[in-house]
Design a protein with these regions (language model features):
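ATP/Mg2+-dependent ligation/transfer catalytic cores
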Residues: 1-168, 190-193, 207, 320, ...
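Active-site-proximal, well-structured secondary-structure segments within enzyme catalytic domains
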Residues: 167-178
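A short, contiguous, amphipathic alpha-helix enriched in charged residues
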Residues: 152, 191-204, 246-249
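Short, solvent-exposed loop/turn segments at the edges of secondary structure
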Residues: 59-61, 99, 170-172, 220-224, ...
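Loop-rich catalytic cores of soluble enzymes, especially ATP-dependent carboxylate-amine ligases
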Residues: 176-186, 203-313
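Conserved hydrophobic/aromatic pocket- or pore-lining residues that grip, position, or stack substrates
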Residues: 104, 198, 227
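Conserved small/polar residues in nucleotide/adenosyl-binding loops
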Residues: 324-329
Length: 334
């Protein structure tokens, strides 16, 4: 489940043993230890909402994604999924699809290593060679942590998540996996469970995976979660007008979106390193320096999807999708 830490929530998990063939029950936890309750009223409720085969334990074991509820079974204030479920239902006839590109950075966690606390591929002090050869690279001099990325991708497949690819990113030790296209709220479930699997699998290498949007200051790329979006109207022949309409709609609420796309977004959206500045909105074909990129093939086909390049790696996929279903989907449906 997702805890109540701010400005960036974390994942929590625990193990329950149940009878074979029974459904996961309503459960609970100490909310005072997760910033979701006070000590004198500490109980919070776990409501199972999605389950997946557990690729870590194997067998008949499952991973259960839960919403956090109050004891009266109303959604907890930290529960961002519940609002998305309602919004997605309202716009279901427009069949919104999402594809999210989750970037992350591996860090060394061995206390006896001179590289403790450094991104993988960084020397004990100073910096590696400048960016340029690491993106989608191959070879021990360019790529760091591939075995973890591969193990994670395999686990996502075994869990039935909608993973569609992985690649090494621009900065050493930085990787990305893609989930989608998947509808809402499922896309959020898949991203959060994929994050949990990433953290859990990296444990076995004594490596941490972080979603820090600007892991290294200076001339190094940040980490985002580019969000690809389309509706039925955008995917149909002649849907290019609906794509442009969605871009215009997103521009009207640009400030609201940026404020809810992940903490410390100003550190990443600077106008450099393939970003538009956080206080400027733009869209364009093939433009990775724009807020919204329209892929060149979409312009050729006159239908398809858009890519929002603003969301941070640490953004909440439920919140991002909620903003889209209430803004872009609403506008293109008219």
């Amino acid at each position: 489940w997702i805890d109540g830490l701010t400005p960036t929530a974390k994942l929590r998990s625990k193990t329950k043993i149940i009878e074979q063939g029974t459904e996961p029950p309503i459960w609970g936890f100490d909310g005072s230890s997760t910033q979701q309750a006070t000590g004198d009223q500490s109980d919070c409720v776990l409501k199972p909402v999605a389950q997946f085969p557990d690729p870590v334990r194997g067998g008949d074991n499952i991973l259960v994604m839960c919403e956090v509820m109050n004891v009266d079974m109303t959604p907890h204030a930290s529960n961002t999924r519940a609002a998305l479920v309602e919004s997605a239902s309202n716009f279901s006839e427009f069949e919104p699809w999402f594809g999210m590109e989750q970037e992350y950075t591996f860090y060394e966690q061995s206390y006896d290593s001179l590289k403790y606390g450094q991104p993988l591929g960084f020397p004990p002090s100073g910096y590696p060679a400048p960016q340029g050869g690491y993106y989608c690279g191959v070879g021990a001099d360019e790529v760091y942590g591939r075995e973890i990325s591969e193990a994670h991708a395999t686990a996502c497949i075994e869990a039935g998540l909608g993973i569609s690819g992985t690649n090494a990113e621009v900065m050493p030790g930085q990787w990305e996996f893609q989930i989608g296209p998947v509808g809402a709220p499922d896309i959020g479930d898949h991203i959060w469970v994929a994050r949990w699997l990433l953290y859990r699998i990296a444990e076995d290498w004594n490596i941490s995976a972080t979603l820090n949007p600007k892991p290294v200051k200076g001339d190094w790329n940040g980490a985002g979660m580019h969000t690809n979006f389309s509706t039925k109207q955008m995917r149909e022949d002649g849907g290019y007008e609906a794509i442009v309409a969605a871009c215009e709609a997103l521009g009207k609420n640009a400030d609201l979106h940026v404020k809810n796309y992940g903490a410390d977004i100003e550190d990443r959206l600077t106008g450099d390193h393939e970003t538009q500045s956080y206080d400027t909105f733009s869209y364009g074909v093939s433009d990775r320096g724009a807020s919204i990129r329209i892929p060149w093939q979409v312009e050729v086909d006159k239908k398809g999807y858009l890519e929002d390049r603003r969301p941070n790696a640490n953004g909440d996929p439920y919140v991002i999708c909620l903003l889209y279903t209430s803004d872009a989907a609403d506008d293109t449906s008219r």
